[in-house]
Design a protein with these regions (language model features):
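Short, small-residue-biased leader/transition segments that mark boundaries at the very start
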Residues: 1-3
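Active-site regions of oxyanion-processing enzymes, predominantly non-cytosolic
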Residues: 5-8
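Feature marks hydrolase-like catalytic cores characterized by long aromatic- and Gly/Pro-rich stretches
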Residues: 13-143
Length: 143
């Protein structure tokens, strides 16, 4: 019997509105090192096939800066990481052309609930509809 569980954690705030050119590389370096250490430990314990990691942000960033950074925007990014993930880039980047922006924001073209749906159905083997409140486009990225 395979037991699946879910855990949440968070990293220091990416809620920056200034100094992003200097701050974001440091934040992403911290995140990258933490993920690498976590998966290195999983591999040492022969457990990396049993774990996927979903990274996401609850908000995106605006296209145009405010002078030294960017404010909250509509579209964001997410990552699914693990030995059971078919690597690659999934989805399309939204247009950053001024005429395609909505009130200065990128227009999301993929609902992140599709990632939750995929994880709940394909990883946990459960019905996702009551969890994500519907059905959404998904990317079949698990092996």
């Amino acid at each position: 019997m395979c037991i699946r569980d879910s855990f949440y954690t968070q990293h220091a705030s990416f809620d920056t509105h200034a100094g992003e050119m200097a701050g974001h590389p440091m934040l992403w370096n911290d995140v990258s090192q933490a993920i690498a250490a976590f998966f290195d430990d999983l591999k040492e314990h022969d457990a990396s096939d049993n774990v996927i990691m979903y990274l996401f942000s609850e908000f995106g960033r605006r296209v145009h800066d405010n002078g030294s950074g960017t404010d909250h925007g509509a579209a964001g990014v997410s990552f699914v990481i693990g030995d059971q993930v078919k690597g690659g880039h999934y989805g399309e980047y939204p247009s950053a052309k001024n005429e395609d922006l909505e009130q200065g924001d990128l227009v999301p073209n993929y609902d992140f609930r599709g990632d939750y749906q995929m994880i709940v159905e394909d990883w946990f083997g459960l019905d996702s509809k009551p969890i994500v409140n519907g059905s959404f486009e998904t990317h079949k990225i698990l092996k």
